[in-house]
Amino acid sequence: MTKKEQALIEQYAKSLVEVASEHHSLDTLQADVLAILETFETTNLDQSLSSLAVPHAEKIKLLTLLKGNNSVYMNNFLNLILQNEREAYLYQMLQAVLNEIAIVSNQYDVTVTSSLPLTEEQKSRVRAVVAKKFAVTAGRLIEKVDPSLIGGFIISVNNKVIDTSIRRQLQAFKMNLK
C-alpha cells in the first residue's frame, strides 16, 4: 500500500470518528464497525470489493446489504465510500476507524494469552493490571489459549507486552546458562 493510499484511509477514518465523537456516538460506531469487520472476516467480501472483475453495480449491492441496522453515521460513511468509489479500501478504513476510536477514547483491545482459559475473576484482575500498568482503559478482552506457555500469561495492549509465561522464563534461564 502506498503512502498516498494510507493517508487516504487514515483521513476517512479520522473524519468518521470525529463526526461520531461530536455526536457522542463512539460506542455505537464501534459496534457497527466490529459487526461489519466480522462480516468481512467470515466472507470474502474484501476480495470482492477490491476486485476489478466485480462490476461497480455489484459492489453497490454488496455494500447496501451492509447498511442494515447501522447508525446514521455509518450508513452515511458507506454511501460516501460508494459515491467516491473507494470500496477497495473499506476493510482497511474500518480497521483504521477502530484504531482512531482507541486513540480518542484511550480504550484499547487487550489480548491475553494463557495456558488455560481465564476465569471471570482473572479477567477482571487483568483489566485492573492493564489500567494500572498501561494507563489505558481495557476495551475488548481477546483471550487466546496457548498450552505451550506452560503457565503464566502474556498481556498485549497497544503494542506493549507483559510476558510472565513460564516458557519465556525457561528460555531466559537457558540463555543465562550458556
From Swiss-Prot:
GO molecular function: proton-transporting ATP synthase activity, rotational mechanism
Keywords (A to Z) from UniProt: ATP synthesis, Cell membrane, CF(1), Hydrogen ion transport, Ion transport, Membrane, Transport
UniProt cross-references to InterPro entries, sorted A to Z: ATP_synth_OSCP/delta_N_sf, ATPase_OSCP/dsu
Membrane topology listed for this record: Peripheral membrane protein
Gene Ontology CC terms: plasma membrane; proton-transporting ATP synthase complex
Transmembrane region(s): none
Coiled-coil region list: none
Recorded superkingdom: Bacteria
Annotated compartments: Cell membrane
Family, similarity comment: Belongs to the ATPase delta chain family.
Binding partners and assembly: F-type ATPases have 2 components, F(1) - the catalytic core - and F(0) - the membrane proton channel. F(1) has five subunits: alpha(3), beta(3), gamma(1), delta(1), epsilon(1). F(0) has three main subunits: a(1), b(2) and c(10-14). The alpha and beta chains form an alternating ring which encloses part of the gamma chain. F(1) is attached to F(0) by a central stalk formed by the gamma and epsilon chains, while a peripheral stalk is formed by the delta and b chains.
Task of the protein: F(1)F(0) ATP synthase produces ATP from ADP in the presence of a proton or sodium gradient. F-type ATPases consist of two structural domains, F(1) containing the extramembraneous catalytic core and F(0) containing the membrane proton channel, linked together by a central stalk and a peripheral stalk. During catalysis, ATP synthesis in the catalytic domain of F(1) is coupled via a rotary mechanism of the central stalk subunits to proton translocation.
PANTHER family per the UniProt record, alphabetical: ATP SYNTHASE DELTA CHAIN (PTHR11910)
UniProt name for this protein: ATP synthase subunit delta
Upper classification of the organism: Bacteria, Bacillati, Bacillota, Bacilli, Lactobacillales
Encoding gene (name): atpH
